[in-house]
């Protein structure tokens, strides 16, 4: 089988879609040496992403950094590469695909946030998504997604038959492990002035409910006076004025720290040393940090919204993400009731066994095998 994969998010500093692409693509190549793989990049790439002798890698012009260049890359460069290589199937793990390619296509859709919450996206990118994403959903021969919530959402929102959509849950990457108490103390000394801390990781953006989280933390500090900090790891995204305002108005500003991008070697340690992960996002397709927290034996406070209850199971304290009071009460519950927090950890040890990159990769491979067609030679 000749499998072409869109690997443009395999960048030097892996984030989000890059990690997803890495975890799936490396397993496909390693577990199926009998198959040939074509990795399609949109710029120069690192050799570590060529996972084996059965992988051919191409950098296609242009670097797809803008909606007009996305169109050029997917509708001109990609179809030509697929045709010349004789691909039997094209897999796109980032919710984009080529409408002009004559090859059977499978894509992963992680969520429909661009359709449901377009106000959080720059204007031109928003228009691109609103026009093309519905077309992509109907063009794909099969759609993979990362939760049953998103599967149902695609069917309802885009009118795609459920038989064309299947779920392959994300897994947790290697390195997320519990720490010994002395190691936790080292992390707290480095990042939190030696204090316990609540932790958030992800984009710093209003869609992630960061303004309410900051105000809820402020409430928690006022009510309890607890010697606890709030650490937020992640890049500042577009439209962060509301986040900045919430921070500037916080009475506990000295105990709130924006860490920016955290190296992949440090993120598991920050997660493992946290008092709890605070993940009260308004909209998610999976909520990977919750699974990472479960693997580090860290309690989770999560939003009772979208896919998060499905992924969290009984491993998280679920709260109303629109209520700052409810979030603050959740923080207080975890801070004051350590027996309850340990119960969340125990539940997380069981819940995390439901999610595996190995299982996800094999499901995706079976979908590709069923979808593959005669290589396009036209």
Show which residues each predicted segment covers.
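Carbohydrate transferase catalytic cores enriched for Leloir-type hexosyltransferases
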Residues: 1-378
């Amino acid at each position: 089988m000749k499998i072409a994969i869109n690997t443009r998010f395999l960048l030097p500093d892996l984030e989000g879609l890059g990690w997803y692409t890495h975890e799936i693509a490396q397993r496909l190549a390693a577990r199926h040496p009998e198959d040939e793989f074509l990795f399609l990049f949109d710029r120069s790439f690192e050799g570590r992403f060529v996972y084996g002798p059965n992988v051919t890698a191409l950098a296609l012009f242009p670097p797809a950094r803008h909606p007009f260049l996305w169109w050029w890359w997917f509708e001109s460069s990609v179809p030509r590469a697929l045709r010349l290589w004789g691909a039997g199937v094209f897999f796109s793990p980032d919710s984009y695909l080529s409408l002009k390619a004559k090859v059977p296509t499978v894509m992963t859709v992680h969520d429909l946030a661009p359709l449901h919450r377009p106000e959080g996206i720059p204007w031109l990118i928003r228009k691109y998504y609103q026009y093309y994403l519905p077309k992509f959903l109907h063009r794909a021969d099969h759609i993979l997604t990362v939760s049953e919530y998103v599967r149902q959402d695609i069917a309802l929102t885009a009118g795609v038959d459920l038989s064309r959509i299947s779920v392959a849950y994300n897994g947790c990457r290697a390195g997320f492990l519990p720490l010994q108490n002395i190691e936790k103390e080292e992390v707290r000394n480095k990042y939190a002035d030696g204090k316990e801390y609540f932790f958030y990781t992800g984009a710093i953006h209003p869609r992630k409910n960061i303004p309410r989280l900051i105000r809820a933390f402020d409430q928690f500090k006022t009510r309890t006076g607890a010697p606890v900090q709030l650490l937020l790891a992640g890049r500042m995204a577009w439209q962060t004025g509301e986040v900045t305002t919430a921070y500037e108005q916080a009475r506990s500003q000295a105990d709130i720290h924006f860490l920016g991008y955290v190296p992949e070697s440090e993120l598991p340690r920050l997660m493992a040393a946290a008092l709890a992960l605070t993940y009260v996002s308004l909209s998610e397709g999976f909520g990977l940090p919750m699974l990472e927290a479960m693997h580090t034996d860290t309690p989770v406070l999560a939003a009772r919204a979208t896919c998060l209850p499905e992924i969290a199971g009984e491993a998280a304290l679920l709260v109303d993400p629109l209520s700052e009071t409810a979030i603050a009460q959740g923080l207080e519950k975890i801070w004051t009731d350590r027996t309850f927090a340990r119960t969340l950890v125990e539940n997380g040890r069981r819940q995390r066994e439901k999610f595996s990159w190995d299982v996800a990769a094999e499901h995706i491979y079976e979908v590709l095998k069923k979808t593959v067609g005669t290589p396009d030679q036209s």
